[in-house]
Amino acid sequence: MMEQYYEIKKQYPDAFLFYRVGDFYELFEDDAVKGAQILELTLTHRSNKTKNPIPMAGVPHMAVDTYVNTLVEKGYKVALCEQLEDPKKAKGMVKRGIIQLVTPGTMMNEGPNDAKDSNYLTSVVTTKSGFGLAYSDLSTGEIYSTHLKSFAAVSNELLSLRTREVVYNGPLTEQSKDFMHKANITVSAPTPIEGEHAEISYVEQNLTNGAEKSATRQLVGYLLSTQKRSLAHLQIAKSYEVNQYLQMSHTVQNNLELVASAKTGKKMGSLFWVLDKTHTAMGGRLLKQWLARPLLNVDIINHREKMVQALLDGYFTRENTIDALKGVYDLERLTGRIAFGNVNARELLQLSRSLQAVPVILDALNQSDSDVLTDFAKKIDPLKGVAELISTTLVKDPPLLTTEGGLIRDGVDKQLDRYRDAMNNGKKWLVQMETDERQKTGIENLKVGFNKVFGYYIQVSNGNKSKVPLDRYTRKQTLTNAERYITPELKEHENLILEAQTRSTDLEYDLFVQLRDEVKKYIPALQKLGNQLAALDVYCGFATVAEQNNYCRPSFHTDSQDIDVVNGRHPVVEKVMTAGSYIPNDVKMDSATNIFLITGPNMSGKSTYMRQMALIAIMAQVGSFVPADSAALPIFDQIFTRIGAADDLISGQSTFMVEMSEANAALQYATKRSLVLFDEIGRGTATYDGMALAGAIVKYLHDKVGAKALFATHYHELTSLDETLDYLKNIHVGATEENGKLIFLHKILPGPADQSYGIHVAQLAGLPRAVLREATKLLKRLEAQGSELAPVSQQLDLFAQPEAASDEVDDNNSENSPMTDAEQEVLDDISNLYLADKTPLQIMQMVANWQKDLKDDK
């Protein structure tokens, strides 16, 4: 047996091999030692009498999914080695083989995962022009593909998808390996694709880009190789361009806490937490997808808004629809299990009950006065035949296992009914035999029983053994207080009953497989229905949230970038505050205002105001209503943020480097259609350095980018920029001082703040009084010194147009200052440099090389 084990293990050296032996899956050697530690199993040894006993640990086959999930959740792979023949009928060694390789990206059992989470496997291929990327959730069969120009873009997509595993076709650089490790992404090699596969041809039929085709073929090939079965539920790959949606980096999504709180990593405290009123797992997953990819297409946005408006206006339509949706199970994943062949009878009944809810939903929609709802209903196929087929074939409460009978209703199959009659008649005969034998022997407590080891038997207590007719009874088993016997007639009827039972069980399983295969024919229709119900679930949720929180329907204009939000609110902050206590604020930025320079004390609400604007924009572009009295918005193509102070552990960057990298991304790639949020730029370095950088960034945003930008700062000197920058406007968050106490007004007011109230905020934070007294003394001393210096309006000469100097070099006079080849090469290197793809250490090394080249050139 161990030779067979070692031969199979050679093929899967990087996976835990679960080797089936009887009712257990066994782990051996290093797998056993490591597995016992992780899974808290008892470590034993095989061949204890030898000098080198083999470490061994096992898990019951009935509970194997739990143990597999635990290992895969920790990033390991598990190869399931099954017995491929009945051990009782095997000649010699039982034939075994791998039936499935479970990996982080292919795990279908939810385990500890939230049912509203997707589990993506991603395939990446390198090409001459960049990268092809495709990803899939095996449990639902969905597949998407795109092509990207840089590994930085690939990295961002992987983080945004929260992918668990990447199939990569080439060697990774050390930097890429480090990224994958820190992002907790398992990297797997592609598997060779031999011959033609129907799944691959079907999936890639609509793809035209070569890189996307390669990535998709690699993805499906890996799935076929690891799952070792037909994957009929894989859907046609949908190609997308990242610029088809409102683009937000993974960092931006985290900063804005779209699906998880930045502090806890949990749902509570996120935008998803506020908006998720879905009642199905597939609706929850779809909502997450929408939040990650807000739309740019106004027509699609307007359609979603119309659906939400109709459900908001039609209270009874919405409530009846929601009540029916509560009875809908996860159609997408049930369909995946049907295709996968591991669906059980209870899950098929869940599918049937889900389908039985669809006519109720259609009735609710069709009774509405809204054309958009009735049109939506017309596109839904309720698949009544599938629901009826399942419900009339399976019993109401079938067992969990499909191999032990008790699945199929009476009357479904005539042969099955005959077997059942034989079993029932045999059992009636046993009851009658027990009565007859009591009378014949005079043993009142005589019993006829059954167990799997000895079959049917007659049990007599020790006190009545003397009455046993040994001429007819043969002793079978001795117990402490009784003896068990058999008779020729009992043995004959046992054979008849057990044969009927075995044949009945086998036939039931065959009938169940036939039912499953028949339902499998409807997989595309079931997937389409699942998508429709998921969308309807999200629409109902949006309508419910809008009603509960008094949201408004936003409008859009495509001919300008004007923003007009009246009494806007932060959707998350509002929910955690006492009802009615949130102070709303307007955001009004017309063609004469591109930048809001926001000042005010810490804790006053600057960051909340900025995030509020971004979240309103995102909510609007996914089709939700928004927290405001009214909102007229442009369609934003990108959102950039620099909010919060934290080191980037994944890329190994310091706080200041993160700050500069995020600022650079906005300065490089933002357009006039973008939204930029910068909070406290420059605080990670010396005061004057920070002030200089902040001022220069504001000026660049104003002069070169032209995006709508909200720029919060503590550098009050920057407020004089409105004298030279026409499209910049100063606003501040109001605060007042009463009886020595600072009171935040949380209201946005025009003009700059008159002071920062830093010491007051420190007092609110509970700093020691001695520290506060010393800070007050130092502040007065600095203010006294500052009064002797130039006024604030003159302190920003750094950002003013420099006066011409007599020794100034004329950059345009190339004849007087010709550029050397070395200088030109350095300039070209800098022009082509993509900073977001480099670490600080790499940049320092590049600068050192440039310095050396220029010195050598002299």
Swiss-Prot record:
Keyword DNA damage appears in the UniProt entry: yes
Function: This protein is involved in the repair of mismatches in DNA. It is possible that it carries out the mismatch recognition step. This protein has a weak ATPase activity.
GO molecular function, one term: ATP binding
Keywords: ATP-binding, DNA damage, DNA repair, DNA-binding, Nucleotide-binding
Pfam families linked: MutS_I, MutS_II, MutS_III, MutS_IV, MutS_V
Region annotation Disordered: where it falls in the sequence: 803-823
Official protein name in the record: DNA mismatch repair protein MutS
Annotated binding of ATP, by residue: 600-607
HAMAP family: MutS (MF_00096)
One Gene Ontology cellular component: cytosol
